[in-house]
Design a protein with these regions (language model features):
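Histidine/acidic-rich helix-loop-helix segments that form or flank divalent-metal centers
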Residues: 5, 9, 24, 35-72, ...
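Post-HEXXH active-site segment of zinc metalloproteases
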Residues: 22-28
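Short acidic/His/Gly/Ser-rich catalytic and metal-binding motifs that mark active-site loops
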Residues: 16-18, 59
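Short active-site segment of divalent metal-dependent hydrolases/proteases
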Residues: 15-16, 76
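Generic helix N-cap/helix-start motif at coil->alpha-helix transitions
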Residues: 30-34
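Generic hydrophobic alpha-helical membrane-span motif
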Residues: 18-19, 79
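Short pre-active-site segment immediately N-terminal to the catalytic Zn-binding motif
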Residues: 1-2
Length: 125
């Protein structure tokens, strides 16, 4: 489905709490959300993609859409103001995405995503 990743972006955090959370909740919200979406009738594959938004699912073989979702979710979150911090600038967010959030992680689309973001920055300037 051509809207699979977009739909996952909208629904993958359905069980994520608001405000500061403890580490255990951070580790389980994606799985809880995927289980909830499954009960609503979403396909197993779609639910797996949503569960893999972060790396806590433990799935060794990730869906390719999960890698896209991970990039969008992490990067987008860094561009938002939070009660505990102001939003990062685009270039700062890209550095943090690569060297903190995805450090030692294999995301097959990271380089293409960075290239896309940089090209869009040039369009905006």
């Amino acid at each position: 489905d051509e809207n699979l990743v977009l739909t996952a972006c909208l629904l993958c955090n359905c069980k994520k709490g608001k405000g500061p959370q403890d580490l255990e909740k951070i580790k389980t919200y994606a799985k809880e959300g995927a289980e909830y979406l499954s009960k609503l009738g979403f396909s197993n594959r779609f639910c797996k993609i949503c569960e893999e938004v972060n790396r806590y699912s433990g799935n060794a073989i990730r869906e390719k859409e999960s890698d896209v979702l991970e990039l969008v979710d992490n990067f987008g979150g860094m561009l938002l103001d939070r009660p505990e911090r102001i939003a990062f600038k685009v270039d700062e967010a890209l550095v943090l995405l690569e060297y903190r959030n995805l450090k030692d992680k294999n995301n097959r689309y990271l380089q293409k995503f960075k290239q896309f973001v940089n090209e869009m920055q040039e369009v905006l300037v």
